[in-house]
């Protein structure tokens, strides 16, 4: 074991990727640092853990997850597949390109269960504060053990922050919303469309969450869905029952007034207004301050905190790629901590960051964003031994996905893609997505006899 201690905060996909990167090194017979990982939930998986709870959890901590019932992947699984652990290896059979949350969570766990990673994780443990001790070149981290109700501290040579950035809601105020008589919630607290059956729903925001929650509510029987946008509409071909309107100006009782002068009564308002990058355990001089960008400012290679080279952030970007991008970041971070990748001086790092930040500003369309993140991942892979894969083909799938959604927002999840890792083409799910109301793993993997007439695709337009 190397004479280094590495602390990892968070055991979601990013934290698990970091553990997997070190495990990969250890399997080659090479020494690795002493590693400790801390997770405030009682299980790994981060955002992929579903809980019925909202607000606070069992121990009074803010709920981390934003997952809801009936959530299915909104992008092809072939675009997020691990290069060292494929869907075929895990499920032993082809599955559809858009599986539900429970299926993806099972896949994430499958890879990490092959290792002893759980031995490195202390669950129900919250990071409360971090200090950097300049004289020792170490971080002092104060933790709370939620089960024992005890506080303790640890010291690390490197600190990896993998806490994600989709758990602290951005909650704007709209005049009159405090007197709205119906349900008002942020998407973070949305737990299922079945509570909005036969309701008129207003979604404020034009994010992926607005898009998906809107379609989910339509699918499960909401009377109407309105999506209110600030700058640009989503622009999909919406079915009857879903419409887009410009931003809400104010509320009067249960009536929302819009910038175009129109108004309508609603039963519920769901704020799909994004999330904040929040790190309450980090002091100001160690805190990443960024919005949801494809390339966060002040992170060298999107990973190393430029003001303190021993502080590492994983998964802090806006994301097209997810699991496999976290892997490439973790492999880069590992090799840097092991001394294989030397950082240039701060002036050169500043220029490198500025180059990427400026490049993002010139990327406007969804396809350009995909190309941007593809090039970013290519650069990271070239610097490590992470198993390479055909990123250009994955990028083409992403672009096809963008077109699929624009063409048919309700049925794009019925399309199938071919894995670049295995060459296996996905199978169509036994039930068209708009007809499938059961998102359980058991139902998904079962061979179900279907009534073809009953499942024939309806014209929702």
UniProtKB/Swiss-Prot annotation:
Source organism of the structure: Myroides profundi
Temperature dependence: Optimum temperature is 25 degrees Celsius. Retains 20 to 40% of the maximum activity at 0 to 5 degrees Celsius.
EC assignment: 1.14.13.148
Family (UniProt): Belongs to the FMO family.
The keyword Iron-sulfur appears for this protein: no
Keywords of the record: FAD, Flavoprotein, Monooxygenase, NADP, Oxidoreductase
Induction of expression: Expression is induced by TMA and HHP stress.
Keyword NADP set for record: yes
Residues reported in the UniProt entry to bind FAD: 14, 39-41, 47-48, 64, 74, 127, 319, 322
InterPro entries, per database record: FAD/NAD-bd_sf, Flavin_mOase, Flavin_mOase-like, FMO-like
Protein name: Trimethylamine monooxygenase
Top EC group: oxidoreductase
Cofactor: FAD
Any matching Pfam family: FMO-like
Positions that bind NADP(+): 72, 74, 206-207, 209, 230-231, 413
GO MF annotations in UniProt: flavin adenine dinucleotide binding; N,N-dimethylaniline monooxygenase activity; NADP binding
Reaction(s) catalysed by this chain's protein: trimethylamine + NADPH + O2 = trimethylamine N-oxide + NADP(+) + H2O
Function: Catalyzes the oxidation of trimethylamine (TMA) to produce trimethylamine N-oxide (TMAO). The produced TMAO is accumulated in the cell, functioning as a piezolyte, improving both growth and survival at high hydrostatic pressure (HHP).
């Amino acid at each position: 074991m190397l004479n280094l201690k590495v602390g990892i905060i968070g055991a979601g996909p990013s934290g698990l990727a970091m553990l997997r990167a070190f495990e990969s090194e250890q399997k080659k017979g090479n020494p690795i640092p002493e590693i400790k990982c801390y997770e405030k939930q009682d299980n790994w998986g981060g955002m992929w853990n579903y809980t019925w709870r909202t607000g606070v959890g069992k121990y009074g901590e803010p709920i981390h997850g934003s997952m809801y019932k009936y959530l299915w992947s909104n992008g092809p699984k072939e675009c997020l597949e691990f290069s060292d652990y494929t869907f075929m290896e895990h499920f032993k059979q082809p599955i559809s390109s858009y599986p539900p949350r429970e299926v993806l969570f099972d896949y994430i766990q499958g890879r990490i269960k092959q290792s002893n990673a759980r031995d490195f994780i202390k669950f129900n443990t919250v990071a409360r504060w971090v200090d950097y001790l300049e004289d020792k070149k170490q971080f002092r981290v104060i933790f709370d053990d939620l089960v024992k109700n005890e506080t303790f501290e640890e010291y690390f040579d490197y600190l990896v922050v993998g806490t994600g950035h989709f758990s602290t809601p951005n909650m704007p105020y709209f005049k009159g919303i405090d007197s709205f008589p119906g349900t008002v919630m942020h998407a973070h607290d949305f737990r299922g469309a079945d509570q909005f059956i036969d309701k008129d729903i207003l979604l404020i925001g034009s994010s992926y969450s607005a898009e998906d929650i809107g379609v989910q509510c339509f699918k499960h029987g909401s009377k109407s869905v309105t999506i209110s946008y600030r700058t640009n509409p989503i622009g999909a071909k919406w079915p009857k029952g879903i419409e887009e309107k410009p931003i809400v100006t104010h509320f009067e009782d249960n009536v929302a007034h819009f910038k175009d002068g129109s108004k309508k009564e609603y039963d519920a308002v769901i704020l799909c207004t994004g999330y904040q990058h929040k790190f309450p355990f980090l002091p100001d001089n160690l805190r990443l301050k960024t919005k949801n960008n494809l390339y966060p400012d002040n992170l060298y290679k999107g990973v190393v905190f430029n003001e303190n080279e021993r502080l590492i952030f994983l998964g802090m970007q806006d994301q097209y790629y997810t699991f496999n991008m976290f892997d490439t970041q973790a492999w880069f971070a590992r090799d840097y901590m092991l001394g294989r990748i030397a950082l240039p001086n701060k002036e050169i790092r500043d220029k490198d960051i500025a180059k990427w930040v400026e490049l993002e500003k010139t990327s406007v369309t969804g396809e350009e964003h995909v190309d941007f993140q593809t090039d970013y991942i290519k650069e990271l892979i070239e610097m490590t031994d992470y198993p390479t894969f055909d990123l250009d083909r994955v990028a083409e799938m992403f672009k096809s996905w963008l077109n699929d959604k624009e063409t048919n927002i309700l049925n794009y999840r019925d399309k199938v893609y071919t894995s670049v890792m295995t060459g296996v083409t996905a199978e169509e799910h036994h039930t068209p997505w708009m007809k499938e109301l059961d998102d359980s793993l058991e139902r998904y993997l079962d061979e179900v006899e279907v009534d073809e007439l009953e499942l024939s695709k309806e014209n929702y337009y």
